[in-house]
Regions:
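Short beta-strand-to-loop acidic/aromatic patch adjacent to the donor-nucleotide binding site
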Residues: 68-79
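Short, well-formed alpha-helical segments that are part of the catalytic scaffolds
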Residues: 1-16
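Acidic helix N-cap motif at the loop->helix transition within catalytic regions
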Residues: 4-8, 29-37
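Short loop->beta transition adjacent to catalytic acidic/histidine clusters or analogous donor-positioning motifs
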Residues: 12-22, 30, 41
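A conserved acidic beta->alpha catalytic loop
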Residues: 24-33, 78
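Acceptor/aglycone-binding surface of glycosyltransferases and processive sugar-polymer synthases
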Residues: 48-65, 82-159, 186-195, 199-205
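Hydrophobic helical membrane-anchoring modules
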Residues: 131, 154-234
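Residues at the starts of beta-strands that form the adenosine-phosphate
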Residues: 19-20, 70, 175
Length: 234
C-alpha cells in the first residue's frame, strides 16, 4: 500500500527513463488508481498480497519478456532517490554482468537504529555464507543483470528474498558491486514499513540457517568449481 508516495516516486524516475514497470503487490488502498493516471506505465498487478520476493520475481520476469537486459528495482515508499539511478547504470556500463547494489550511508544520523542492526546482522550471515564482505545486503535499490541471472528468482516470498538473491548470485560467481546512494528517512510518524518484526525475523533466521547448510554442501564447492573452470578457459 503506497498511495501516498508512489506518484512522487514515478515522477522522479520519469526524469531518467520512460521504461517503468510498477508491480502492484495486492494493494488494498488507492495505489493502483494513482498509478493508472500515468500514461505509458507498464503495470503488473495481482489481487492477493504475495510479498516482496514474489513482486521482485514478477517484475524481473516481465522486464525480461519485454526484451530488457537489465532492471533497476526501487521501493515505492519514497526513501530511495531516483537521482541515484545514473550511478548504478554508469557502474553497470563498466561491469555489464555484475549485480549493482545501492549501498546506503550508515553514518546518516537519521537512519533508525533498527536498520543499522538489521544490516549488520544480515552482512554477518552473508559473509559466512559466501566469504564476501558487502556494506549493505538489505538494500532494495539494485540493478540486476537479467541475462546473466537467467531464470534465477528467489524461492522465498517476503523480505528475506533480497538476501537470498545476493547469496545465490555470489554462489554463481556473479560479481556484486556496491555503489553509494542517498536515502531519505521520513519522521517516525510518516514511515511506511510492512516488516513484521517477530514473524519476519524468524523467517530470516530460518533462511540464514538453511543457506549456511547449503553453502557447505553446494555454495562454496560451486564457487570453487566455477572459478577453476573460468581459469581453465582463460
Amino acid at each position: 500500500n503506497s498511495e501516498t508516495h508512489v506518484s512522487d516516486v514515478i515522477n522522479d524516475v520519469l526524469q531518467y527513463t520512460q521504461d517503468i514497470i510498477v508491480v502492484n503487490d495486492g494493494s488494498t488502498d488507492a495505489t493502483l488508481q494513482v498509478v493508472s493516471r500515468f500514461v505509458g506505465i507498464d503495470v503488473v498487478s495481482y489481487s492477493q498480497n504475495r510479498g516482496k520476493g514474489y513482486a521482485i520475481s514478477k517484475g524481473l520476469d516481465h522486464a525480461l519478456t519485454q526484451g530488457f537486459t537489465h532492471a533497476v528495482t526501487i521501493d515505492a515508499d519514497g526513501q530511495h532517490k531516483a537521482c541515484d539511478i545514473p550511478k548504478l547504470v554508469e557502474t553497470a556500463s563498466r561491469h555489464e554482468d555484475a549485480l549493482i547494489i545501492g549501498s546506503r550511508h550508515f553514518g546518516n544520523p537519521f537512519m533508525p537504529q533498527g536498520n543499522r542492526f538489521a544490516n549488520r546482522f544480515s552482512n554477518f550471515w552473508f559473509r559466512l555464507q559466501t566469504g564476501i564482505g558487502l556494506p549493505d545486503t538489505q538494500t532494495g535499490f539494485r540493478l540486476y543483470p537479467l541475462l546473466k541471472m537467467g531464470k534465477m528468482r528467489p524461492f522465498t516470498r517476503r523480505y528475506e528474498a533480497e538476501l537470498e538473491l545476493l547469496v545465490r548470485a555470489a554462489w554463481c560467481n556473479i560479481e556484486l558491486i556496491p555503489t553509494t546512494i542517498d536515502v531519505y528517512y521520513p519522521p517516525i510518524d510518516e514511515r511506511i514499513s510492512h516488516f513484521r518484526k517477530g514473524r519476519d525475523f524468524v523467517r530470516i533466521s530460518l533462511l540464514n540457517t538453511a543457506l549456511c547448510i547449503i553453502a557447505l554442501v553446494y555454495g562454496y564447492p560451486s564457487m570453487f568449481v566455477r572459478k577453476l573452470w573460468k581459469k581453465f578457459l582463460s
